[in-house]
């Protein structure tokens, strides 16, 4: 496990939960995750869940992605997807507002790996260098990803070679990410 990435993700999650406490006097709340089972759910009110992060309970790797495409995934990405179960979290980095994607449950972890495989298959078909997404943006055409060759965090336009480097490392990106509600 890449401890720098795991620690940076836990630290961002703590900052995110603290902003919820300061501004809304509650745990993080999600309507999108209402009715979806997870060890993160603390309470349900109306059609929303209140959640807190929980330790990841499965093998700490995304080896299914590696096996499917016969590649080696950068260690920080293994750590990112297997440090915790949590709801998606909003943040801002270099003026970009984004939604940091998280794994909600054991079942969700399977879906996340399938989506990563699909993303990599499309890139391979288009002869693009491999990236694994970690966040979404307002524009559905753009995502925040980690380049599997360099380890850099990039803003990429899906289906194209257009990439803008945001950070030299995933841990550095997470350490500079500002939580927003």
Swiss-Prot record:
It comes from Klebsiella pneumoniae subsp. pneumoniae (strain ATCC 700721 / MGH 78578). HAMAP family: Syd (MF_01104). Belongs to the Syd family. This is Protein Syd. Gene3D superfamilies: Syd protein. InterPro entries: Syd, Syd_sf. It is a peripheral membrane protein. One of its GO terms (cellular component) is cytoplasmic side of plasma membrane. Interacts with the SecY protein in vivo. May bind preferentially to an uncomplexed state of SecY, thus functioning either as a chelating agent for excess SecY in the cell or as a regulatory factor that negatively controls the translocase function. Keywords: Cell inner membrane, Cell membrane, Membrane. Pfam families: Syd. Signal peptide: none annotated. The keyword Membrane applies. Transmembrane segments: none annotated. NCBIfam families: PRK04968.1 (NF003439). It is found in: Cell inner membrane.
């Amino acid at each position: 496990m890449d401890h720098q990435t795991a620690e940076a993700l836990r630290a961002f999650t703590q900052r995110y939960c603290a902003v919820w406490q300061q501004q809304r006097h509650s745990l993080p709340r999600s309507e999108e995750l209402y009715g979806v089972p997870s060890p993160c759910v603390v309470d349900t009110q109306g059609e929303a869940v209140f959640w807190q992060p929980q330790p990841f309970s499965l093998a700490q790797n995304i080896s299914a992605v590696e096996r499917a495409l016969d590649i080696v995934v950068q260690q920080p990405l293994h750590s990112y997807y297997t440090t915790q179960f949590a709801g998606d979290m909003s943040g801002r980095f270099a003026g970009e507002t984004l939604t940091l994607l998280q794994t909600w449950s054991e079942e969700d972890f399977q879906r996340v790996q399938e989506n990563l495989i699909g993303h990599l298959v499309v890139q391979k078909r288009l002869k693009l260098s491999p990236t694994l997404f970690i966040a979404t943006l307002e524009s559905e055409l753009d995502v925040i990803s980690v380049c599997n060759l360099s380890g850099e965090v990039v803003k990429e336009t899906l289906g194209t070679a257009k990439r803008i480097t945001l950070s030299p490392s995933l841990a550095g990106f997470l350490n500079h990410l500002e939580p927003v509600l």
